[in-house]
């Protein structure tokens, strides 16, 4: 019997029992790749929770406990798909509050939509949903960015070999007399035939990253021959969890996953300098996660 929940530990037990034993206001980020209630039994877990109403009643006490243990600056991300995301949203609105809903993130996990000749009566599904809520309006959030595409980067095609690096001619829409004189003195200004100004925009001074939207299409699902693969059904890629962890927590924070599976969220938490608590009812999941944790070489 577990009497005290310790940090940086993995537990093999019913997640509701673990949640009930945890202290209030003790976790900064909860990420759970929950059961989608597909009605199927997979190699590593049973995904049959009954009707949608029965599934939500199974989830309700767990969501209530998640709300209790979350710190005021904390976040929770529930990873699901079309089978249950709408029901989860309604339950989360009720428990966490509509005002604490932050985003519904669409993860396009695959570009493979199957053969165009395949017969079907609906569109193929190639995405999952990340439902994100915070505990309050004072939540941790670090805006993630990604590089602009090659089309923009290819614009930096000029180089005067003067040590300033690559640049392109950008429109100068607003300017002062002082700014014009500085550009002219540095040979960074030209007047177009229209009479409008252009200036040299250098790559090393340009913001080459853009803010990420709620559509994540740059991270693919794991292939069976990936070096990350643990042969665990529905294992998620580390890149996805790295983005979530960096976006919604700080170094030293506590990350918890109560539907741990192969343990990717826990492995990433350790690698990124977070504390962690992991839980799964499947002994194989616990075994795989512990092995992955033991294989981590911090700073190596």
Model-based region annotation:
Residues 1-290, 294-298:
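Core catalytic lobe of class I
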């Amino acid at each position: 019997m577990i009497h005290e929940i310790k940090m940086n530990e993995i537990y093999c037990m019913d997640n509701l029992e673990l949640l009930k034993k945890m202290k209030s206001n003790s976790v900064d980020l909860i990420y759970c790749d929950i059961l989608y209630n597909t009605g199927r039994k997979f190699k590593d877990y049973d995904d049959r929770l009954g009707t949608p109403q029965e599934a939500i009643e199974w989830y309700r006490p767990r969501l209530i406990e998640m709300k209790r243990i979350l710190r005021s600056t904390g976040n929770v991300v529930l990873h699901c798909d079309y089978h249950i995301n709408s029901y989860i949203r309604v339950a989360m609105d009720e428990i966490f509050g509509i005002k604490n809903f932050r985003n519904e993130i669409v993860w396009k996990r695959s570009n493979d939509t199957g053969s165009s000749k395949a017969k079907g009566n609906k569109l193929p599904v190639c995405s999952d949903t990340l439902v994100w809520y915070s505990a309050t309006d004072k939540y941790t959030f670090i805006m993630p960015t990604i590089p602009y595409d090659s089309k923009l980067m290819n614009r930096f095609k000029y180089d005067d070999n003067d040590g300033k690096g690559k640049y392109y001619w950008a429109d100068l829409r607003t300017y002062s007399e002082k700014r014009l004189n500085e550009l002219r003195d540095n040979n960074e200004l030209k007047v177009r035939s229209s009479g409008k100004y252009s200036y040299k925009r250098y790559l090393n001074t340009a913001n080459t990253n853009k803010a990420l939207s709620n559509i994540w299409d740059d991270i693919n699902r794991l292939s069976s021959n990936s070096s990350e693969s643990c042969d665990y059904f529905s294992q998620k890629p580390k890149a996805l969890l790295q983005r979530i962890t960096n976006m919604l927590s700080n170094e030293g924070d506590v990350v918890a996953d109560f539907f741990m599976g192969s343990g990717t969220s826990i492995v990433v938490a350790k690698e990124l300098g977070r504390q962690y608590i992991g839980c799964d009812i499947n002994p194989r999941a616990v075994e795989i996660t512990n092995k992955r944790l033991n294989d981590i070489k911090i700073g190596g």
